[in-house]
Amino acid sequence: MIVREALVSDPRVLPADATPQQVAELLTHPHVESALVVDGERLVGSITPETLVSAIAEGRDLGSVTAADLADGEVPTIGPDESLEEALRVMAEHDLERLAVVDGGRFLGILPREPLIRRMAADELGETDPD
């Protein structure tokens, strides 16, 4: 099985022009540890609560920045035709709960770890998809 067959194509993301207030609103939802920032179909980066704290501590004027300005552009990604085993390896290497899926610079969605593990376990045991 490959990444394309398991990805979530409509995840909750932030537009590049989102305000810090919009970023904070998303990051304060339960179970949200970070947010991906996209500009159209291009993945710009990722923002964590620590990103906002650092910006405030550095004295940045949050009234004049966007999500794209705050985003860390170093986001581990995987291509849609890679194996799910490779995706899990990348997730383990970077301690990720989800992995961004990108094809030729175009953001396609995310691959969440928990359902991926359940799906792979079911496949290994010859069971139907548990979802």
Specify the residue positions occupied by each region the protein language model found:
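Tandem CBS (Cystathionine beta-synthase) repeat/Bateman regulatory domains
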Residues: 1-131
